[in-house]
């Protein structure tokens, strides 16, 4: 797809009109340009771009083998010998073996307001313009703290639907936390300790992402998957040194729809490519507390309340006797709806997304709550739950530090985003298809895990067990109903000698090892890294290194 050159210096990149090469001061060695495979600057086996130069043309510089073609490497003085090459320097870059395109350097974040300490890694923020559209998706890339060239490339997006990936950046697993005084506090459990992280604001209309076409803000699962794939491809085009990196996608909440549909889109894209070099090196996805199946997932919310002993036994017995444990009965049986209303009154003012934590719903939680509630409210005229049934005084608690910080003019300038866009955690501009919430995602898991062409792809579903809405009971239900045989059932995993949760592994075709894992995180709410940051980082690293 894109040529990845051999890199020996960290602060220089050399570009032509078509590609970029790395620099070296070593003398010419024994390698010769393979004329049999490299015809018309194309590798006949892989289709990759070949070097323009050979040792014969520039005998004082080395030629190195790369993917079957010999890549010419040369020192920056070549720019003086051949004016068709241009050298670009950035003294702000942290040391690493990457070579950056001019477009990438324009997005480099060199002076982040409130950040006092020098970073050992680079960060970039800007837009990926989607081909053939007027859609512009905002990304924020933070490289791995150490050995970035050896670490995978991981994309993160939040749920909602319609909530910003910068929620994850600033309140969950990103490297920074804005404070009340406008400073930046470092997160000791940031996920870029083990990966190059890209935080996306998608779909279009979310956060700083925008389009000049009003209809683009009407979107559903299928189009979101296509746009997210285009965003990944666009980012790798801007940062071609990631072309051969292992790629993972991650999310939570409505990511239970985003992740399997995007993974399926990537698989289809890869299968359509003629050359292996054009394929994404896709390794799988991880999703936390996923909204996967409206019926098996949401229907388990009341069971979680009972399991937490938040309900009296006589009321629960009546609920079971009337068959109310299925979502179908909850939606269509007036007795069940009345019992649910009684449950909510008995429970009182608790946060359903983090039952053992103070009452404080984030915007992402509120968005999911309203999205799921819509189905019940539509039944109001039939005698089921109506709008006034949800008069429990939940208080939204948008992270005001994040909103205040991101809406500062100097921060917007540092991030290279449109200054006239008012950043919100969850979009009021994006019009997401309500019908998509009823679509079960299990079929995608079966397609992906039965894929012959991608046996290396691994899926991790993790669940904070203090969440009732996208909780562990419902998640277990749909996972076990997939029918994959167990390899390992409910074993304990530990952090600092303490029980962090439980692991179940499933046998899938075309692999002797487990490609499908379920993990619980004990005591974590809906956004696992917010409530259990150390455990979340441990889980994430185990997944990336296949150490679960």
Where are these regions (language model features)?
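Extracellular Cys-Trp
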Residues: 30-33, 37-58, 62-74, 78-90
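Terminal and linker regions of secretory-pathway proteins
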Residues: 2-5, 11-23, 87-548
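Intrinsically disordered, low-complexity regions enriched in serine, threonine, proline
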Residues: 27-29, 34, 103-105
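Intrinsically disordered, low-complexity serine/threonine-rich segments
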Residues: 5, 13-14, 18-29, 49, ...
């Amino acid at each position: 797809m894109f040529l990845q050159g051999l890199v020996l210096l960290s602060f220089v990149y050399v570009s032509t009109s078509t590609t970029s090469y790395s620099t070296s001061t070593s003398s010419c060695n024994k390698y010769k340009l393979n004329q049999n495979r490299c015809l018309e600057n194309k590798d006949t086996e892989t289709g990759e771009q070949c070097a323009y130069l050979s040792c014969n043309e520039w005998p004082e510089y080395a030629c190195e083998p790369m993917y079957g073609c010999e890549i010419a490497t040369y020192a920056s003085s070549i720019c003086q010998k051949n004016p068709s090459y241009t050298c670009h320097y950035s003294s702000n870059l942290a040391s690493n073996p990457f070579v950056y395109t001019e477009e990438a350097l324009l997005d480099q974040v060199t002076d982040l307001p409130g950040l006092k300490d020098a970073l050992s890694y680079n960060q970039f923020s800007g837009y990926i313009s989607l081909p053939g559209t007027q859609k512009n998706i905002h990304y924020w890339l933070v490289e791995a703290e150490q050995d970035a060239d050896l670490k995978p490339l991981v994309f993160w997006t939040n749920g909602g639907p319609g909530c910003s990936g910068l929620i994850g950046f600033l309140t969950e697993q990103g490297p920074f936390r804005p404070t009340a005084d406008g400073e930046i506090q470092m997160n000791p459990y940031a996920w870029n300790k083990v990966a190059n992280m890209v935080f996306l604001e998608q779909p279009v209309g979310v956060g700083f992402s925008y389009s000049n076409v009003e209809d683009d803000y009407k979107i559903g699962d299928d189009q979101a998957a296509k746009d997210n794939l285009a965003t990944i491809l666009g980012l790798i085009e801007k940062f071609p040194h990631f072309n051969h990196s292992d790629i993972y996608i991650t999310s939570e909440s409505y990511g239970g729809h985003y992740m399997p549909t995007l993974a399926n889109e990537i698989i289809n894209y890869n299968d359509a490519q003629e050359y292996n070099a054009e394929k994404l090196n896709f390794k799988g996805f991880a999703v936390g507390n996923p909204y996967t199946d409206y019926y098996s997932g949401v229907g388990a919310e009341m069971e979680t309340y009972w399991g937490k002993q938040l309900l009296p036994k006589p009321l629960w017995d009546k609920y079971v006797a009337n068959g109310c444990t299925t979502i179908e009965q909850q939606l269509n049986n007036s007795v069940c709806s009345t019992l649910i209303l009684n449950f909510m009154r008995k429970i009182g003012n608790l946060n359903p997304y983090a039952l053992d934590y103070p009452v404080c719903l984030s915007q992402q939680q509120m968005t999911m709550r309203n999205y799921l509630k819509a189905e019940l409210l539509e039944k109001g005229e039939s005698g089921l739950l109506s709008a006034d049934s949800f008069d429990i005084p939940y208080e939204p608690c948008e992270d005001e530090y994040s909103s205040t910080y991101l809406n500062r003019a100097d921060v917007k300038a540092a991030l290279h985003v449109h200054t006239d866009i008012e950043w919100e955690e969850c979009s009021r501009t994006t019009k997401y298809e309500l019908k998509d919430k009823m679509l079960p995602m299990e079929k995608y898991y079966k397609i992906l895990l039965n894929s012959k062409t991608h046996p290396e792809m691994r899926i991790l579903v993790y669940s904070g067990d203090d969440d009732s809405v996208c909780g562990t009971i419902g998640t277990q239900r749909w996972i076990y109903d997939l029918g994959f045989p167990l390899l390992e059932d409910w074993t304990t995993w530990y952090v600092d000698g303490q029980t962090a949760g439980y692991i179940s592994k499933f046998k899938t075709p075309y692999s002797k090892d487990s490609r499908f894992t379920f993990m619980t995180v004990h005591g974590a709410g809906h956004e696992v890294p917010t409530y259990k940051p150390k455990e979340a980082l441990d889980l994430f690293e185990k997944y990336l290194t296949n150490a679960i």
